[in-house]
Regions:
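Electropositive phosphate-/nucleotide-binding environments in soluble metabolic enzymes
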Residues: 14, 18, 37, 66, ...
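NAD(P)-dependent Rossmann-like dehydrogenase/reductase catalytic/cofactor-binding core
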Residues: 199-200, 228-331
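Rossmann-fold dinucleotide-binding core
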Residues: 111-209
Length: 331
């Protein structure tokens, strides 16, 4: 029986949470919070999360599975959170004290819709004693499951914590890049989903690789401008946490945000797309939140791609007309 003394809990059992558990359990014992008892029983029986990442074999001897969130938070000093952004309030609003002096590593890639807060702002508002960091791509859960060479970006300002997390995340297939740009890394992980969605819309409309290359180049330029408007820090987006994550999310067939957009471009309604995918595409809600963030600081005029995405998703604007308008702006 494993000794669960590694002091790490993972919260969330979707594709990304499962991939993170798969990586960590190669190196340490850990605690894994899963919402439903039935899902826990299935994971123990099959050694796989058959609902979200069925090809990923899990070493369940090294994983303590539980539906008890309070226990998961009390058991560990390092809490890795991999849930959809809109679940955060339900999970943590009433558990602020349990997070005191914990290190939170967010793998969340969206904005909390009802408050328009990023995960970083939400957690630090909830409990100021938290040490906060971000784990991001470029990395798809599906390729982790296939043991393909992948790179993760770890952004945190504490050197000792950074070294510990680098050690437990590093495997033969997973390499870690270190950053101290916590805010920028998180914002970029949110923004790239919006840009992947609009790329998907273009693909669904029948645009080819030639156009998509120009569109994604324009997305990269806009991402850099928007990052600076939201967090006034000079940064080069040529690093993998920014440009690399944007590229893989816009181009990959694994990208749920690209798939979401492709359905919209092909003529599906929002509701039909959600029903067909049966997965959370963070770019949908993030488009709404980012549009209003940028509108508040009078920057939306400098973000025509985000504005077009908002018009398509929330103003019932014709996708073909919006992409045609964008094509004239970026040419």
């Amino acid at each position: 029986m494993a000794n669960y003394s590694s002091n790490v809990s993972v919260i969330g059992a979707g594709s990304w949470g499962t991939a993170i558990v798969s990586i960590l359990s190669r190196n340490i014992d850990l605690f894994w919070w899963v919402r439903r008892e039935g899902q826990i029983n299935q994971i123990k029986k099959k050694q796989r999360n058959t609902r979200y990442l069925p090809n990923c074999l899990l070493n369940t001897d090294k994983i303590k599975l539980s539906t008890d969130l309070d226990k998961a938070l009390r058991s560990s000093d390092f809490i890795i959170i991999a849930t959809p952004s809109d679940y955060l309030c339900d999970l943590f609003d009433k558990r602020a004290k349990l997070l005191s002096n914990k290190t939170i590593i967010s793998a969340v890639k969206g904005v909390i819709t009802k408050s328009n807060l990023t995960p970083q702002k939400y957690f630090l508002n909830l409990n100021s004693s938290i040490s906060y960091g971000v784990i991001s791509g470029p990395c798809h859960a599906e390729e982790v499951a296939m043991n393909k060479k992948s790179y993760l970006t770890l952004s945190i300002n504490d050197q000792r914590t950074s070294k510990f997390l680098t050690n437990i995340f590093s495997t033969n297939d997973i390499r870690i890049k270190i950053s101290n740009d916590v805010t920028g890394t998180e914002l970029s992980a949110i923004l790239k989903n919006v840009y992947a969605l609009i790329t998907g819309v273009s693909h669904g409309l029948g645009y080819g690789d030639n156009f998509l290359a120009v569109l994604i180049t324009a997305c990269a330029k806009e991402l850099e401008k928007v990052l600076f408007s939201l967090d006034r820090k000079e940064r080069s987006i040529s690093q993998s946490a920014y440009l690399g994550d944007l590229l893989v999310t816009c181009y990959s067939s694994h990208s749920r945000n690209r798939r979401f957009g492709a359905y919209i471009g092909a003529g599906y309604s929002i509701d039909s797309t959600k029903s067909v995918m049966n997965m959370v595409a963070e770019g949908y809600n993030a488009t709404y939140c980012l549009y209003h963030m940028l509108k508040e600081n009078n920057f939306i005029i400098n973000a025509p791609i985000i504005k077009s995405s908002y018009n398509i998703l929330y103003m019932d604007s014709d996708p073909s007309k919006e992409i045609e308008n964008l094509s004239n702006l970026i040419s």
